From Swiss-Prot:
One of its GO terms (molecular function) is ATP binding. ATP binds at residues 119-125. It comes from Parabacteroides distasonis (strain ATCC 8503 / DSM 20701 / CIP 104284 / JCM 5825 / NCTC 11152). Pathway: Cell wall biogenesis; peptidoglycan biosynthesis. One of its GO terms (biological process) is cell division. PANTHER family: UDP-N-ACETYLMURAMATE--L-ALANINE LIGASE, UDP-N-ACETYLMURAMATE--L-ALANINE LIGASE-RELATED. Cell wall formation. Its main location: cytoplasm. Belongs to the MurCDEF family. InterPro entries: Mur-like_cat_sf, Mur_ligase_C, Mur_ligase_C_dom_sf, Mur_ligase_cen, Mur_ligase_N, MurCDEF_pg_biosynth, UDP-N-AcMur_Ala_ligase_MurC. Pfam families: Mur_ligase, Mur_ligase_C, Mur_ligase_M. Its EC number is 6.3.2.8. The gene is murC. One of its GO terms (cellular component) is cytoplasm. This is UDP-N-acetylmuramate--L-alanine ligase.
């Protein structure tokens, strides 16, 4: 089936962030778009307002007539949806073309110059930065992102003039193997998704295969020190980047003062002084070096790079400041792997040195909790105070003996609390705070506004 010739597209698992970018793409192309998701969310409601016909019950009777013809309807699904799903089974049994999200994204973008950002962590912010740097310059771009970029309030960007497409290259279920990168970035390769890959070696190998997909006229930009051996085709250039050591692209003269961060960007035959971070957290220096490097390699001028970095507002839920006063700060972040959790905490502690940092963490997935309990505990022990919630299961069934308790018992700081999500607001109301970091990839974000209200009330008390 030629994706460009279908008239209707139906999404099974419409509320996922990657799926929603495709929904917006097909809506922009004038297709009829519908789908199913398990629960309503702000994102699915936004998609409905934009024209998508979405329902929340796995029921074939709710599939609209516009999506009942196998001849002109493409069905897209996410691997998070179980194979036993009733609607998915119906479409397969009735001869519909059924494709994984990753394959559809690969088909859409294969004719453009794909700038693909991969990594266990850092890929959403880095790809969003890169998209913004290109978009606000004459170079321009299309983009499929894994977060809602606040500068544009969308995870999709389209251009009538540019053939660059920035793509967040997701390693889950080996999705990024469907892509054909012109340029690729690897930000990190810390083992994750071991329920899919089985071993850390298999996880690392998937990144090596990803590098073999880069077009011969392209390049790879990889963070210095990552344990990945590229398998590049002949003609593919390789660059490294870093923050703390010399590489092809790196930062130096880093200054952190009064909640602001500036640095000098250094690359082959280029130096850009006094780059200011629009989202001033230390980890964004690293993300920024990678994004600036790819943008510069594709013709973005130094003055546009500086302007873009200063005006970058960040994706939702990536160091998202919800409250920033002299008395208390509230930050929401998506970190859900021990390494990125550690980065988040250290960035906040450096930015707000001398102030008490309280972390509210919701673990994501039973398998990830089981596989990395000790590493999670080590990262969380960097906090001054911890409130630990129950595990958010997402696509998984409970595993006997696996709960937040196995993390909690290994955390070494004395000020720690284990509570259910439903109890959180009462726990927060009983405490006093200076900097609060709410972290996790589940539904902890729905508690950010209620927590903010409690903190604001505490500020107003005489």
């Amino acid at each position: 089936m030629d994706i460009n010739k279908v008239t209707a597209v139906y999404f099974v698992g419409a509320g996922g962030i990657g799926m929603s970018a495709l929904i917006r793409y097909f809506l922009a192309k004038g297709k009829r778009v519908g789908g199913y998701d398990k629960t309503p969310s702000d994102l699915t409601e936004e998609l409905k307002k934009e024209g998508a016909d979405i329902h929340y019950e796995d029921n074939v009777a709710l599939i609209g007539e516009a999506f009942k013809s196998p001849d002109d309807t493409l069905v897209v699904y996410t691997p998070a949806v179980p194979e036993s799903h009733t609607e998915l089974t119906y479409f397969r049994a009735h001869g519909f073309e059924v494709m994984k999200r990753a394959r559809v994204l690969g088909e859409i973008t294969k004719s453009s110059r794909g700038l693909c950002v991969a990594g266990t962590h850092g890929k959403t912010t880095t790809s969003s930065m890169l998209a913004h740097l290109l978009k606000q310059s004459p170079v321009d771009c299309n983009a499929f992102l894994g977060g809602i970029l606040k500068n544009y309030e969308s995870n999709l960007m389209l251009s009538d003039t540019s053939d660059f497409t920035v793509i967040e290259a997701d390693e889950f279920d080996r999705s990024f193997h469907w892509l054909t990168p012109y340029m690729a970035v690897i930000t990190s390769a810390d083992p994750d998704h071991l329920d899919i890959y089985g071993t850390a070696e298999a996880y690392r190998e998937s990144f090596e295969k990803f590098t073999s997909l880069i077009r011969p006229d392209g390049c790879l930009l990889i963070k210095k020190g990552i344990n990945v051996t590229p398998r590049l085709q002949e003609g593919v250039k390789k660059y490294t980047y870093s923050v703390t050591e010399i590489a092809d692209f790196y930062a130096e003269n880093i200054r952190i003062c009064d909640g602001n961060i500036t640095f000098d960007f250094v690359g082959p035959e280029i130096r850009i002084p006094d780059v200011e971070l629009g989202v001033p957290v230390k980890v964004n220096i690293e993300n920024g070096v990678a994004a600036m490097a790819i943008a510069w390699l594709n013709g973005v001028k130094p003055e546009d790079l500086k302007k873009g970095m200063a005006t970058f507002a960040g994706p939702r839920r990536r160091f998202d400041f919800h409250l920033k006063t002299d008395q208390v700060v509230l930050i929401d972040d998506y970190a859900h792997h021990p390494a990125e959790l550690r980065q988040s905490i250290l960035s906040v502690k450096e930015l707000y040195a001398g102030r008490k940092v309280t972390g509210i963490f919701q673990p994501h997935l039973y398998t990830r909790t089981r596989d990395f309990a000790g590493d999670f505990a080590a990262s969380l022990s960097l906090l001054d105070e911890l409130i630990l919630l129950d595990i958010y299961p997402a696509r998984e069934e409970p595993i006997p003996g696996v709960s937040s308790r196995i993390i909690f018992d290994k955390v070494t700081i004395p000020s720690k609390t284990l509570c259910k999500k439903e109890e959180l607001l009462d726990v927060v109301a009983a405490g006093k705070y200076e900097v609060v970091l709410m972290v996790g990839a589940g539904n902890i974000d729905r508690l950010v506004e209620p927590v903010k209200e409690i903190l604001c009330k505490q500020i107003r008390k005489p």
